[in-house]
Amino acid sequence: MIYHCEDHTCNYWDEGEKLPERCPQCGRKLLRANEADMTGDDWTALGNTLWDAEASDKKRMVDCFRKAAYLGSAWGVCNLGICMEQGNGVEADPVQAFWLYQQAVEMGSLNAVCCLGVCYEHGIGTAPDAKQAAELYRKAAEYGSPRGQMLLAHAFHDGIGVEADAAEAVHWVRAAAYQRYGEGMYWLGVCYEYGDGVEQNWEHAVHWFREAAESGVSAAMADLGYCYEKGCGVEQSWEQAFSWYRRGAECGNLRSMHNLGWCYEKGCGVEQSWEQAFSWYRRGAECGNLQSMHNLGYCYEKGYGVEQSWEQAFSWYRRGAECGNPVSMSNLGLCYKRGYGVEQNWQEAIKWYEQGAQCGDLQSMHNLARCYERGEGVEQNEDRALYWYRRSAEGGNGGAMYNLGRCYKMGHGVEQNWQEAVKWYEQGAQCGNLQSMNNLAYCYEYGEGVEQNEERALYWYRRGAEAGSDYCMYCLGWNYSNGEGVEQNMTEAIRWYTAAAEGGNADAMHDLGWLYDHGEGVEQDMKKAICWYERAAEQNCPAAMNSLGECYAMGRGVPRDLETAMEWYRRAAELGEAMADYNMGWHLEQAGKLSEAYAHYRKAADGNDDSAWWALGRFYENGVVVAQDGKEARRCYETGEKLGSVKCKMRLARCKLLGIGGRRAKKAGLDLCRQALELAKESSEKEDYGYEAEMNLLRRTIAENES
């Protein structure tokens, strides 16, 4: 049964087994049609309804257009040509489509004029002829066809069959827009957005985007949402942005689907929901949106809104990469590099990094540079590494800026240049790269490549700390603890050490443990001290291992256990902790294992441990294990004194008084001994480092030589 709306201006036609009560377009009454009385345009209107219905019989649609054409409907002939061109309901036949368009043009169809012009422009069913296409577009445009006006605007914009003229293009876009043609209103908004053929004006852009969006143009909905998101030509409003993105997404606009997912991901204009974000990313990805494919892969990678799956992440990164998304290429390369969701394959990783880099993706450039620097999946090549670090850095990648600065610092692939290193650290830091902030602060602190400036160092340590760098948190805590570049403040020191420690910084864990151990800036708490020492030791922090050894050796916070202490010392010493070697030497000396003690003292001294030089000096002074040698003893004490050892200072003063290893200077020696003794008293009041025995020795020496 065929039926139509009683309102002929509505022109709704359809067919079915039953007659519905109301027209779905205007709500008026539907009337049963008599096929014998139907005109060609009636059959075309029925065919159009079947065209728009997803589940309709497309062959029946073509039959309707054939009947329309037979009855002399130019509209029907043109639509039959479109079916032939697209292969919709019939096998595609471009030549037949071209002929049908010609017939429809002769019958007066303006749409057919446009279709024929498109055939000439793209060579559909005929040889390409841009000039002929432009003439047909102009004919349709001048007769008032909004589609023709847009096609002519496109020709003037891109110089197709006519000389390019942006202003003339806008003239015809405006003509279509003033006819309330959706595409015309949208593109007029785009022209105002970019200042293309017209002076840039965001307010006008918003006006035409709104007009087009309200007429149902989904692309305009996406652009209007963007204007609200950024506050361009309209007061910024995430709620309005979200609303328009939703409308665009529900109308099938892929960009809107992605942006809607992003709103749900970030909680912008709507309550945050990873599940909703994932849902819209999936819809966009399945419809072919590259950004949605990438974000869907990211959701699977992190398990956001869906169960974590590297296999699914890899699959979507691959789809995005193969469709040309450079960011997906970078992530796909990472999957191959790490073996995430796929068997590890360095060659594939390099391949995708190179493709992403060639497409302009900054992270791909950065990753490729790292591979060249390390020789991962490709022959090591510092020149190529530097090239890609520079390309990425100059494009704005903060990580590449840091690594380029590091290359200049180390002289990798380029002559060492601290000034260039600082320049790139500065740029990386300004871009928010934490490692750049770390290194820039270090350069200011120690005057490397830039004039030393504690204030600037502290500024960047603070910036890095507030941005989440555990290393900067640690350095900031250290500055507050030691009053370096800032007034000493143990409360602030504890705060930043704690933040750094909880962020995983092993040095901060150790120093925080040390403060709890010695009750500095905080109430002494050996339980917390041991806890932080152990956490740092688990991360192979040698200083923490040594401190644990000291706690076990002295029974401080744990039961005294010399065997466990020596094990911790051994582990710390193997990692290069000189103080641990000294501590091992001390305990071995007390146990009478003098040769072993000497070996550890020597190793500790080579690591610049000041107490080890004191111990070595004693061995040489007294001829323990080694031949007695006053000069060597004196040299050891001098070295230790320069490193800050108070015990070495006392021994050196005694050597000068007694003439050990050099000329005796009684008066000057006595003065030095008294000065050293006073310094030792002050130091011993702060911390007992075994000063008492040395102080007693010095007192006896002074007493014996004063008479």
Predicted regions: what they are:
Residues C5-D7, C23-C26:
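Short cysteine-rich clusters marking metal-coordination/redox-active sites
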Residues M38-K67, L71, I82:
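Alpha-helical segment of the N-proximal tetratricopeptide repeat
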Residues G27-A36:
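Short Cys/His-rich micro-motifs in 6-15 aa windows
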Residues M38, D52-A53, Y70-A74, Q86-N88, ...:
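Short helix-capping/linker turns of helical repeat alpha-solenoids
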Residues W43-A53, V77-Q86, V113-H122, L151-D158, ...:
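Hydrophobic face of amphipathic alpha-helices that form TPR/SEL1-like repeat modules
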